[in-house]
Amino acid sequence: MAVDKLPLLAKLEPVSLIGLVLLSGLFFLLTATRKSDLPLVNGKRPFEFGIAKARQRYLKNAHSLITAGLEKAGAFRIVTENGTRTILSPKYADDIRSHRDLSLSAALVKEHHVNIAGFDAVKVTVTSDIIQDTVRTKLTQNLLNITEPMSEEATILLKAQWTDSTEWHDVALRPKTLGIVAQLSSRVFLGDKVCRNPDWLRLTVNYTIDSLMAAAELRLWPEMLRPIAAKFLPKCKKIRKQLEEARNIIQPVIDERRLAQQAAIKQGKPQERYHDAIQWLAENTKDRTFEPAAMQLALSTAAIHTTTDLLTQTILDLCGREELVQELREEIISVFKDGSWDKTTMYKLKLMDSVIKESQRVKPMAIAKMARCAEEDVKLSDGTIIPRGEIILVSCSKMWDANVYPDPNTFDPHRFLKLRQQGSDQESFAQLVSPSPEHMGFGFGKHACPGRFFAAAELKVALCHIIMKYDFKVAEGCNPQVLKSGMRLAADPFARIAIRRRQEEISF
């Protein structure tokens, strides 16, 4: 992505420009860190100037580069689109899972420009523990209260967007799954008054993508110049506008609730409690100041695209497996024989749990997780040194290790169900929400995805409705392929499926 920097530089006075250059040099000297001694797997080749070619090789062949690196060393460096990163073998996962000098927040600061206006949704996750506390406590504790509303929303959305047509018809899968996840998530985060607002749904979908593009745009600039560049760059201007639009949507809801609470207090009536994130954030912040719009965008950023990708991949993995789909229908019918969602429903959907976890094992969203930044020089248990300022990631290679998973490259929907049936020692490990070095779909350690319990519930609600209400198969002429870019893996964004309405045996 090329950015013309000359028009912006031309607006600076010569003296100011010289001052900025000198400040950049001083900043570099003051923050310079020791050089890593770890091998670099994709450095410059003979007659190459700069690292542009190395970045291209990374984007195209990251998986093979990391595999080759792990065969030679347990720790090595790799040139990525965001600079050089250190990749660690999964054997180090326990070393770093709670290491006090390895910081997720510091890694986010370096990657996402959190101190620049517009990136507020990332900033609130770094500078405050409100989001994490709300997800770990309020959201997880209220899963039973939010399951029925999500189910109601799924009924409304599927009827409108997937239709009741009993004739086979083709649809683009990812837009459909994105719509489901965005609306179900918004029902939980903002309640029923906002969750169907098309402007809010558009914002929640677009802000994540646009903020990532804005971050990439800024990385083309020296760090000292980025706050200035952000004032003029189109993507940065766009996310600032989106943040303001989010405020205009959310603030009236908050104001309306505040007035209703004041009226209830004045009349001596009990205040209405809401089972949504507006209520939970207010309860968790207490006397602390917070930005409601940024908090809501942060929740959406964390939830929507990751869950959408897993839902998309799971549906693609079910296509063409009619016997498996029938097994899932029978499990759903058995679990819902009394026709209600209760506290044991999600646990009882063990085959579905296994299917989702296996989809995530075969194709996670990234081939390395547990991003951390070393705030001091860190010495690992075997003496490996991670220099201060270095960003590290742990390879997910155990997810495809034949010593851990027999026939690891084969999708086995019953794999984790069979493990759970072996006994109590495997019960926890084999559940979708259980992270481990052998399955880092949700990360691992103290920063493992705190929203994984909600994601699992949301996925199961969506799949219950889709599986019971629709027949589906890959559309004729479509051959879904995993999209690979660097360490990222994405369910085919262009995949199309054929669907038709069926008569469900039970009602939710």
Curated annotation (Swiss-Prot):
A Pfam family reported for this protein in Swiss-Prot or TrEMBL: p450
Cited Gene3D superfamilies: Cytochrome P450
Segments traversing the membrane: 12-32
Entry EC no(s): 1.-.-.-
InterPro entries per UniProt: Cyt_P450, Cyt_P450_CS, Cyt_P450_E_grp-IV, Cyt_P450_sf
One GO biological process term: terpenoid biosynthetic process
Compartments where located: Membrane
Family per record: Belongs to the cytochrome P450 family.
Function, as annotated: Cytochrome P450 monooxygenase; part of the gene cluster that mediates the biosynthesis of andrastins, meroterpenoid compounds that exhibit inhibitory activity against ras farnesyltransferase, suggesting that they could be promising leads for antitumor agents. The first step of the pathway is the synthesis of 3,5-dimethylorsellinic acid (DMOA) by the polyketide synthase adrD via condensation of one acetyl-CoA starter unit with 3 malonyl-CoA units and 2 methylations. DMAO is then converted to farnesyl-DMAO by the prenyltransferase adrG.
Protein name in UniProt: Cytochrome P450 monooxygenase adrA
Gene: adrA
